[in-house]
Amino acid sequence: MSTLGHQYDNSLVSNAFGFLRLPMNFQPYDSDADWVITGVPFDMATSGRAGGRHGPAAIRQVSTNLAWEHNRFPWNFDMRERLNVVDCGDLVYAFGDAREMSEKLQAHAEKLLAAGKRMLSFGGDHFVTLPLLRAHAKHFGKMALVHFDAHTDTYANGCEFDHGTMFYTAPKEGLIDPNHSVQIGIRTEFDKDNGFTVLDACQVNDRSVDDVIAQVKQIVGDMPVYLTFDIDCLDPAFAPGTGTPVIGGLTSDRAIKLVRGLKDLNIVGMDVVEVAPAYDQSEITALAAATLALEMLYIQAAKKSE
């Protein structure tokens, strides 16, 4: 059982092995880790198909197939030789208590950041990003958001716990600056007056990767960046295992290239969310999420000398 909490561990097998077969450390705060992976098995804020609470386990399980590559293509180095990454297992909270989950996740994140660690988190539904943003903003101040998704999640429906409202709430709390934030892959209805730059899926699919990345860098500038990737940004052909799939999304190839292009940004926190393995086929959604998470670590490792 993870020592991040004391209730019954509802994560099933998630705490049995680490992402990419990395070492498990249930007390990461005093470790020498650079980056700490945390699973958040929560899907109570889902409006579509539930099941995202099993996402962390699915991502970890399929990631074992990625662990063998030491000089990863096209990086040609081993991230593990440049970054000290540990997996602290899943957040434990009273199952069914969304408020407790939010408070415990924020407290866990604040403690890690105060200890000089950085976080890569696995959802869970996308609501888990909000307590993570609250913790990161306390440590880094107002941030830019780089957000991959089929939905803007800026919907003002008055619900406190909803995976479609985080980026309506976050600017109002002063956590992120919409004028320096960008949402990539959007292909559903959204409010055009909320300050975010929206790069919809049609234009992202039609433009070159280099062109999109250049615009993202111009928008973000030198602000600290929180990177969040909702797996439904990908087309359902590449990621069927999610709660709210939307046709017309990005290919996995384009998404990976876009993430790689973010390596020069000042990224201070990252997450991958909304994997729901019950709807997956041959683990392709979990594999896409695990690969994107690995690429996120590689863009951090690329900043470090050998």
Swiss-Prot record:
The lineage of its organism: Bacteria, Pseudomonadati, Pseudomonadota, Gammaproteobacteria, Enterobacterales. Its cofactor is Mn(2+). SUPFAM superfamilies: Arginase/deacetylase (SSF52768). This is Agmatinase. Its EC number is 3.5.3.11. It comes from the Bacteria. CDD domains: Agmatinase_PAH (cd11592). Pathway: Amine and polyamine biosynthesis; putrescine biosynthesis via agmatine pathway; putrescine from agmatine: step 1/1. The keyword Ligase does not apply. InterPro entries: Agmatinase (IPR023694), Agmatinase-rel (IPR005925), Ureohydrolase (IPR006035), Ureohydrolase_dom_sf (IPR023696), Ureohydrolase_Mn_BS (IPR020855). It holds the Pfam family Arginase. One of its GO terms (molecular function) is manganese ion binding. Mn(2+) binds at H126, D149, H151, D153, D230, D232. Keywords: Hydrolase, Manganese, Metal-binding, Polyamine biosynthesis, Putrescine biosynthesis, Spermidine biosynthesis. Belongs to the arginase family. Agmatinase subfamily. HAMAP family: SpeB (MF_01418). Gene3D superfamilies: Ureohydrolase domain (3.40.800.10). Catalyzes the formation of putrescine from agmatine. One of its GO terms (biological process) is putrescine biosynthetic process from arginine, via agmatine. It catalyses: agmatine + H2O = urea + putrescine.
